[in-house]
Structure formats: C-alpha cells, structure tokens
Amino acid sequence: MTYPRFSEIARTFAPGWFAAVMGTGVLALTTRSLAQQWPLLALPAAALHWFNSALFVLLAVPWLTRWLRFPEAARQTLSHPVQANFYPTFSIALLVLAAQWLTFTDQVAVALVLWWLGVSLHFIFSFAVLFYMFRGEQVTIDHVTPANFIPAVGLVVMPLAGGPLLQYMDGALREWALTVNAIGLGAGSMMYLGLLGITLQRKFLHKPAHGLLTPTIWIHLAPIGVIPVSLMNLLEHLPLPAAREAALLLMLLFWGFGVWWLVMASLLTLAARAVGQLPFALSWWGFTFPLGAFVAESLHLSRLLGWRSAFFIGVAAWLLLGVLWLITLLRTARAVASGAVFTPHP
C-alpha cells in the first residue's frame, strides 16, 4: 500500500491518539513514585517524562492541522456516538503533562499553563460531546461502552496536578483554581456513578463490546483510581481535617473495587483474545492510563495506611502496566511504519 501523505493523515487523524500520552505519562509518574524505594528507577522515569512531552508535541501537529484545514471532518467526528468520546483525551493529556512537569522539573510556570489550558479545554469538550449526545437520537445501547466515561468523568483528573499547584497560587487566582478543582471532582464523580450503571446494564443485558472496543473494559479502573487520589489532593487545601478519615475510607472502598475489577478486566480480555476478538488498534492504549491510575491509588493507599499488601499489589500492577505499555508502543510503531494505523475505522 502507498504510505499516506501528511494531509491525509491529518484529515483522518483519530482523536484517541492522546491516550498514548495519558498512558505514558502515568507510567512516568508511577515509576517516579516507586523511585523513592528503588532510586535506580529515577532515570527511566525522567526519560519517560521527556519522551512523553515530545510525543505530545508530535501528535499535536496533525491534531491541530485537522481542526484548521479539515474542520468539517473534525466536527463530524465530534458528533460520532463512539469516536467523540476520545476527543477529551487531548485535554486530559495536558492535565497529565501538568502533573509531570510539576513532578519532574522546577518549571512551575509550565505546569500552570498546561493545567489551566487542560482545564479550559476539558470543560469545553465535556460539554460539547455530551451536548451532542443528549440532543441527538443517534446513541443507542450498542454505542455504550466505558469510553463514555472519558468526557465527563475525565473532569476528576483536574485535582491530580491542580491540588499540588494550589500552593503556588494566592488570592483570587487560588480561590478560582480551588473552585475549578471542586467542580471537576464533583461533576466527574457524580457522572461516573450514573455512567457506571449504564455500562453495567449493557454488560448484563446486551451483547458485550468486543473487537476494537475490548480494551475499553479497563477504563473502569481510571475513575476508580483517580477519584480518591484527587479527593485527598483537594482535602490538603480545605479546612476539613475530619473529612480526611472519611476520604481514606472511601479510597479503601474504591481500591477494593479496583482490585476486583482488575481481575475481571484481565479475565474478559484473555477470553476475548482466546477467540480472536482482540485485534490491534489505537484502543490498546486504553489498557495503560486506567491501569496506571490504579497503580497510583495503590501506592498512595500503601503510604497512608502503611499496608505492604497494597504496595505489593501496586507493584505487580505497575509491572503489568510496563509490559502492556511496551507491547502497545511496539505495535503502534509497527503500524505507524506501515501506515496501517492511519486507516480510519467506521
């Protein structure tokens, strides 16, 4: 086959590409966290940070080109009942990068710019995607997958970097940032509860999402891992000391659900693979960020409670994350080299 020209790549550029930035970023952050126990991990963690920053810039070129040169194609994807859910991976990637730059460098200004830009774009995408879905009649139970979590539930990612960044703000700016964090966490958490019920309804009462959408099973782990950590980050800056114990209990409950869902997602994925229902696609990056969110939650919980069991489960999940990330990266590189990954899906 003839390798596609850049204009064609940009015209059909899938919005889900930035799931690669999300997954690589969370691998960098969790590896850096483990470097506290094993200092040798500090160097690969830093390498992942810089690689991911470059990856975002590289992917942003065709993404922005599509909006500038092919706005009709971009808007058409925005109204697609499945593909539209992946547009907010761009804004979530910015929020993850903000956490990276705050963790790996002393460039607080860069982290702040990335965070505010990510916050602004994610609010826009969450309203735009859900507006089309709520107003349209094209969405059916066949279109319901955990990918529906991304636009609204992605709001809970804001306090991951937004909480720690509050110490670098003061006055009205700090109050507005705190307010934005609270809105994001509140809206995303409540939307997760509603969407969780809808996705479980499909699993119980309708045919499962196989094939290209098989990895979306793992997306459940993202809010399970992020919500408690974001809540703890926010409580660090609120005059609610008694709420920390309740938040810790909530984290424990979410973590328990996460352990259970990790096993279930693994079993469902292996079952799909056994019958040839796991073809490679960009959706494989959906394995990485959710699993990384669970790793971060496990390590956070182990530090707060002093539980070695949570730490070892987190390390085991981190090792699995590393394997899945490497496999997906290599398969993606091969697909990019052949041009196959730029063939649009219906």
Task: State the predicted function of each range.
Residues M1-L64:
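N-terminal signal-anchor module of multipass membrane proteins
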Residues P4-G23, Q76-A84, F131-L155, G184, ...:
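Cytoplasm-facing juxtamembrane segments at the starts of transmembrane helices
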Residues V26-S33, A93-L102, V156-Y168, I224-L238, ...:
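Hydrophobic alpha-helical transmembrane segments in multi-pass integral membrane proteins
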Residues Q37-P39, G171-L178, H237-A247, A272-G276, ...:
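Extracellular/periplasmic helix-loop-helix junctions in multi-pass membrane proteins
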Residues L40-V108:
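Membrane helical hairpin/interfacial module
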Residues R75-Q83, A99-L155, L160-L185:
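Membrane-interface helix-loop-helix junctions at boundaries between adjacent transmembrane segments
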Residues L117, P151-A265:
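Generic multipass alpha-helical transmembrane bundles of integral membrane proteins
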Residues F254-F257, F311-I327:
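Small-residue-rich transmembrane alpha-helices that serve as helix-helix interface/gating elements
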